[in-house]
């Protein structure tokens, strides 16, 4: 019963559950005198105006959802910053919506910098005591809303990100450093709002949903600002020598001082409206209705993708699965087969010296397949790992899937060599003609990654 079709359909249910347009639409309600956004109420007057500012992988669809609910008479301006590869999905956005693109392959570029300057200019132009700035924020926002602090330039910031990613930095570590190299991240965007108020509807792509780190927290005033000791600890934990960093970056981080930020008043509100948990619940509901004993194990899976892949292989080959590393602290009780184990979160990849092409989900599944070369499955299984944004690393694949039927073919390609070369994409492209790739195209959102493991008795 552990079938690929069930797993693929369950992943599709994940994507439907976190569809940004409907999520934003459900978060906003309007009557003649009252605007309700998430859990916050605004009394409307004849002078009330709303400026919608959306940035991130879900920005276009989130903007559509907001405009579905808001009267045109209230809307002063809508400005959207979307990933370059999403050009063409902006249909149904009205002509008065300004859409800017940037951050191809999820890295900041000069287009991102230009778009950020445009956002700052619009905030300054429309700021008034009767203005509500509605921010729609999603994963990828860090790359799209970019304004390096002087004297840094974009190339220096990019080099810093590259170094950190090569050392396996988590999104939390990356965004903490980004905040300290930026004029808009870490609540600094709010410095531009002198009179109006802001509310942010946020789709989380960070484990644990820390609102101050999602998209590097441009609309969130930190409860405690980082000091240079926190920054040093991050670099030391990643084994990054400061001498590896560009000189200007090193100087900015070493001379870090507390920022002058607005007081954290009721003028600035932030609400998380979607996360990895929403996707996992949808998959669990579908699989339960399909006859599986379904369990959400965690939405906080982290660590090295290749090592996690080996741990999934351990579950597959253990008769008593609850003794495996990934499950031993889960309080999981297995009563009846078939079972569905669901995981969510975000892992990292340590790149080889001359890396090929790949992503953490493809690497995790490849590592699992490679580990099964020397171990015998104790169950019929199907295992999928895929990113909800549809883009695993700088590739056109969301992830990969394997099951028992793939094991006899495992010797046809040298999976270990592809792993060592950080070249998981090309392995899956060649393996069975690409049949094991998960190809969804860009989903228009991002709530991190999903792992689904179906197990049945042999």
From Swiss-Prot:
Pfam families: DUF4147, MOFRL. Belongs to the glycerate kinase type-2 family. GO terms for molecular function: glycerate kinase activity. It comes from the Eukaryota. SUPFAM superfamilies: GckA/TtuD-like. This is Uncharacterized protein C13B9.2. Gene3D superfamilies: Glycerate kinase, MOFRL-like N-terminal domain (3.40.50.10180), MOFRL domain (3.40.1480.10). GO terms for cellular component: cytoplasm.
């Amino acid at each position: 019963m552990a079938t690929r079709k069930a797993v693929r359909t369950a992943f599709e249910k994940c994507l439907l559950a976190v569809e940004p347009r409907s999520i934003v639409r459900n978060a906003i309600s309007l009557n003649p005198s009252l605007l309700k956004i998430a859990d916050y109420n605004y009394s409307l007057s004849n002078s009330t105006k709303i400026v919608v500012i959306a940035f991130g992988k879900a920005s276009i669809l989130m903007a559509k959802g907001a405009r579905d609910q808001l009267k045109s008479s209230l809307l002063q301006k809508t400005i959207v910053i979307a990933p370059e590869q999403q050009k063409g999905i902006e249909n149904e956005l009205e002509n008065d919506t300004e859409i800017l693109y940037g951050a191809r392959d999820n890295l900041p570029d000069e287009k991102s910098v230009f778009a950020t300057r445009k956002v700052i200019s619009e905030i300054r132009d429309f700021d008034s005591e009767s203005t509500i700035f509605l921010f729609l924020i999603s994963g990828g926002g860090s790359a799209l809303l970019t304004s390096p602090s002087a004297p840094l330039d974009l190339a220096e910031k990019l080099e810093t990100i590259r170094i950190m990613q090569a050392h396996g930095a988590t999104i939390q570590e990356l965004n903490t450093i980004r905040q300290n190299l930026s004029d808009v991240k870490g609540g600094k965007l709010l410095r531009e709002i002198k009179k109006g108020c802001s509310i942010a509807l946020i789709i989380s792509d960070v484990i644990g949903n820390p609102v101050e780190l999602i998209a590097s927290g441009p609309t969130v005033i930190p409860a405690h600002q980082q000091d240079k000791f926190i920054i040093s600890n991050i670099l030391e934990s990643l084994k990054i020598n400061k001498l590896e960093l560009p000189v200007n970056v090193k100087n900015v981080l070493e001379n870090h001082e507390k920022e002058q930020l607005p007081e954290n008043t009721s003028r600035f509100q932030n609400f998380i409206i979607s996360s990895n948990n929403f996707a996992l619940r949808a998959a669990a509901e579908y699989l339960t209705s399909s006859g599986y004993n379904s369990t959400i194990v965690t939405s906080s899976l982290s660590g090295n993708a290749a090592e996690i892949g080996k741990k999934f292989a351990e579950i597959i080959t253990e008769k008593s699965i609850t003794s495996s590393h990934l499950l031993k602290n889960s309080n999981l009780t297995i009563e009846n087969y078939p079972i569905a184990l669901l995981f969510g979160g975000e892992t990292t990849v340590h790149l080889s010296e001359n890396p090929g092409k790949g992503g953490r989900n493809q690497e995790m599944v490849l590592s699992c397949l490679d580990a099964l070369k020397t171990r015998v499955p104790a169950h019929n299984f199907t295992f999928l790992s895929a990113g909800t944004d549809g883009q695993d690393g700088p590739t056109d694949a969301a992830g990969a899937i394997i099951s028992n039927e793939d094991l006899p073919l495992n010797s046809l390609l040298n999976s270990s060599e592809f792993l060592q070369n950080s070249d998981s994409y090309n392995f899956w492209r060649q393996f069975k003609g690409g049949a094991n790739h998960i190809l969804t195209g860009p989903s228009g959102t991002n709530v991190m990654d999903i792992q689904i493991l179906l197990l049945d008795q042999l």
